[in-house]
């Protein structure tokens, strides 16, 4: 009887010791925490054709597969036109500089003082400066130098101030759209960043003031080669991205081309515009239209000549004049051709349309997804509405409201006649401004790409218990388990005799 009791007691201590050992090991391994080395910051100035926007991004100092996990923490719009307008109006220039300083001060307040000197700051100028460089390279260089001088005077770590290419702008926009949609990384059940299983990328459609960009993944066409393709590596994976930028086909510059076509076909300085609503009239100097490198000046061009524009509210006439500025004939009878003779692989998959595309859809009171038929009928009704009714029914500033009939017809022509979206593939487009409170803009993709250059710092491992305590518990309960096992064996042997 005593031997059975001893054996039972030994078995109890053995099982208890093993259970405690397992519990201690689980706590030590699974309850460990990582002490992050903290956040890092980056600043991007998006110097667009119509305005400058300051973005502040942050990411953990440790990175996933060599690319930082970046989030937008601040977005500040600089009042005034884009930097390409510097030097035209001294008073306006000063207002723009003052507003830019206000935005920079907001970033100073957001970035901890001890991290400001290591926080990189970049300026990327887009189509407005690309046009100015074509028109006046000396002026564009002077503006970039003045911006660099200003950025170097700040407490941040200046990296560069440059004009990015249209293809880079399109690629960075594609990276932004897919990053925000979670197509590169997502958090799993253990709160770790992983690549989504079977993730598909979305194409991006960007409509700025002076250029428009399209980008999407597509297999390389061996018969064409690598024209328009870029291979990009993000979060440990490679992607073949087709991207193209059309300079002078941004919403504002394309409207100047429409106005130029109307003015040159008019026999007087009074110009009927089918894209302006009935009841809207305005005057402007010819320089506002023909001063752009995107328009062709007439033989008898007088910059100061006043042109009187009269709205006729004709949706069919508006679409016809908008289509006339696209070189569609050069792609006639050619496969894989968008317009202006530019190669483009077949459209496939989902797309994210942002910037001017989004604002046009929002102005027409459409949601993020709608059919091509709904877009056409809404645009037709909008274009047929007189100026008085538009002002009463749309809470949009008049400077923008007058042009949304043109914008709607431009978006239709670009997407359907240019990029070759059909009634079916149109349904794959989402018109959005932001995702998860992050703006859809090329600047985030720019920051993600540049964060590859910023070294990662390792996390500091913090365990639930000190190593000496863990070792002591491990030794004590291991010894107890061994002794219990020995005592159990002895008890069982004795019970046999």
Located regions from the model:
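Beta-propeller domains
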Residues: 63-72
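A short acidic-Thr-Gly-centered motif at the start of a beta-strand
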Residues: 27-37, 188-197
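Hydrophobic alpha-helical cores of multi-pass transmembrane domains in eukaryotic membrane proteins
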Residues: 13-20, 47, 478-482
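Helix-loop boundary elements of multi-pass alpha-helical membrane proteins
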Residues: 1-13, 39, 490-497
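Membrane-embedded alpha-helices of multi-pass membrane proteins, especially ion channels
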Residues: 18-31, 52, 56, 482-491
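Short extracytoplasmic
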Residues: 40-64
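Helical "lid/coupling" subdomains associated with nucleotide-phosphate turnover
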Residues: 42, 56, 80-114, 122, ...
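Extracellular juxtamembrane-to-transmembrane boundary of type I single-pass membrane glycoproteins
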Residues: 1-9, 29-36, 458-477
């Amino acid at each position: 009887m005593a031997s059975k009791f001893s054996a039972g007691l030994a078995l109890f201590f053995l099982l208890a010791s093993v259970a405690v050992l397992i519990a201690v090991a689980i706590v030590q391994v699974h309850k460990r925490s990582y002490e992050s080395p903290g956040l890092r910051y980056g600043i991007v100035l998006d110097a667009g054709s119509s305005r400058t926007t300051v973005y502040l991004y942050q990411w953990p100092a440790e990175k996933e597969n060599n690319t930082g996990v970046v989030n937008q923490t601040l977005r500040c719009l600089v009042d005034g036109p884009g930097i390409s307008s510097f030097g035209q109006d001294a008073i306006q220039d000063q207002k723009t500089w003052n507003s830019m300083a206000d935005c920079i001060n907001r970033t100073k307040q957001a970035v901890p003082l001890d991290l400001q000197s290591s926080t990189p700051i970049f300026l990327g100028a887009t189509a407005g400066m690309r046009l100015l460089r074509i028109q006046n390279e000396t002026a564009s260089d002077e503006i970039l130098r003045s911006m660099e001088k200003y950025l170097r005077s700040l407490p941040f770590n200046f990296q560069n101030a440059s004009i990015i290419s249209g293809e880079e702008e399109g690629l960075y926009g594609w990276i932004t759209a897919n990053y925000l949609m979670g197509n590169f990384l997502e958090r799993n059940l253990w709160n770790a960043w992983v690549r989504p299983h079977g993730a598909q990328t979305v194409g991006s459609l960007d409509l700025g003031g002076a250029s428009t960009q399209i980008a999407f993944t597509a297999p390389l066409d061996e018969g064409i080669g690598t024209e328009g393709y870029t291979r990009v590596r993000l979060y440990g994976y490679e992607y073949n991205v087709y991207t193209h930028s059309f300079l002078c086909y941004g919403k504002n510059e394309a409207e100047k081309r429409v106005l130029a076509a109307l003015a040159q076909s008019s026999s007087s300085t009074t110009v009927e515009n089918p894209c302006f609503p009935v009841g809207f009239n305005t005057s402007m100097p010819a320089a506002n239209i023909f001063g752009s490198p995107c328009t062709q000046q007439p033989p008898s061009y007088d910059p100061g000549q006043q042109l009187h524009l009269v709205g006729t509210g004709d949706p069919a006439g508006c679409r016809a004049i908008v289509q006339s500025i696209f070189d569609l004939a050069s792609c006639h009878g050619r496969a894989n051709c968008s317009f202006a003779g530019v190669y483009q692989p077949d459209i496939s998959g989902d797309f994210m349309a942002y910037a001017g595309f989004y604002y046009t859809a929002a102005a027409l009171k459409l949601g993020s997804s709608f059919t091509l038929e709904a877009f056409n009928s809404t645009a037709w009704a909008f274009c047929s509405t007189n100026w008085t009714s538009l002002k009463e029914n749309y809470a949009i500033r008049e400077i923008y409201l007058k042009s949304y009939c043109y914008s709607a017809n431009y978006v239709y022509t670009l997407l359907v006649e240019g990029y070759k979206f059909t009634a079916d593939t149109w349904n794959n487009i989402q018109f959005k401004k932001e995702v998860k409170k992050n703006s859809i803009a090329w600047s985030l993709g720019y920051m993600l790409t540049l964060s590859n250059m910023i070294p990662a710092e390792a996390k500091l491992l913090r365990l639930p218990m000190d190593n000496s305590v863990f070792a002591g518990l491990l030794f004590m309960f291991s010894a107890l388990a061994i002794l219990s096992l020995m005592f159990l064996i002895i008890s069982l042997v004795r019970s046999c005799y």
